[in-house]
């Protein structure tokens, strides 16, 4: 169904069964598949292809040659009706690719809201990207990667499958991330190693001086105390009782499966 207030360019192809919301704009030479839902106010500039069982929220801007919901690159994929879900107010720039999930990985590739995905960024099957994240030009996420809120991944950076990028992390450009990056950390290199706390990012987002100090103390326990992670976990949990921002570390530890960058 195409809402009567939506615009569809005469050269665009919107297949029967697709849903186009109010005030959406489907530009020249776009292709929208039969199981696609485009939310209110979302703009497909031109030459955008949206396939598969894909749901896109409202007020997104999707630029030319982006491909969303296409068949993933997992050799086990056998055509199952897996999905892509994208939230609201994202800017998805030229030639970005976002692939549908796999049955083995839960069947869903998910992108939240208010993200900036720069030119040629790639989000593989079963990835989860939170809110207000930035993937710079040519940043690539392998399958099953999680990127938490406010994370920034630099240009030409590759993230290994199943890795977790914590909230407020900054990964420098041209890096290779092979293990999990704890929240608030700056990481750089191939393989990526920690370079301290993303202090400037936390200041910009309104973290108090006391909270930043507590986060830095947790970082020092993890990386500079000479203790094992199991040894410092109780100390970080105790610190989190006073400073709730530190709880992001304890929650992260519970999710981590690949070990932390070192």
UniProtKB/Swiss-Prot annotation:
Q: Name one GO biological process term.
A: lipid A biosynthetic process
- What is catalysed by this protein? a (3R)-hydroxyacyl-[ACP] + UDP-N-acetyl-alpha-D-glucosamine = a UDP-3-O-[(3R)-3-hydroxyacyl]-N-acetyl-alpha-D-glucosamine + holo-[ACP]
Q: Cellular location of this protein?
A: Cytoplasm
What does the record give as its pathway?
Glycolipid biosynthesis; lipid IV(A) biosynthesis; lipid IV(A) from (3R)-3-hydroxytetradecanoyl-[acyl-carrier-protein] and UDP-N-acetyl-alpha-D-glucosamine: step 1/6
UniProt keyword annotation of Transmembrane present: no
Q: Cite the entry's keywords alphabetically.
A: Acyltransferase, Cytoplasm, Lipid A biosynthesis, Lipid biosynthesis, Lipid metabolism, Repeat, Transferase
- EC numbers listed for it are 2.3.1.129
Taken from the record, one Pfam family name reads Hexapep
Q: Where does substrate bind?
A: 73-76, 125, 144, 161
* Gene Ontology cellular component terms for the protein in this record: cytoplasm; cytosol; membrane
Kindly indicate whether the keyword Acyltransferase belongs to this entry: yes
Which coarse location class applies to the principal site listed for this UniProt protein? cytoplasm
- What GO molecular functions are on record for this protein? acyl-[acyl-carrier-protein]-UDP-N-acetylglucosamine O-acyltransferase activity; identical protein binding
Q: Which Gene3D superfamilies match?
A: Hexapeptide repeat proteins, Udp N-acetylglucosamine O-acyltransferase, C-terminal domain
Q: Which HAMAP family match?
A: LpxA (MF_00387)
Task: Tell me which family the UniProt entry assigns to this protein.
Answer: Belongs to the transferase hexapeptide repeat family. LpxA subfamily.
Q: How does it assemble?
A: Homotrimer.
Function noted in UniProt: Involved in the biosynthesis of lipid A, a phosphorylated glycolipid that anchors the lipopolysaccharide to the outer membrane of the cell.
From the Swiss-Prot or TrEMBL record, give the protein name: Acyl-[acyl-carrier-protein]--UDP-N-acetylglucosamine O-acyltransferase
Which organism is the protein's source?
Answer: Escherichia coli (strain K12)
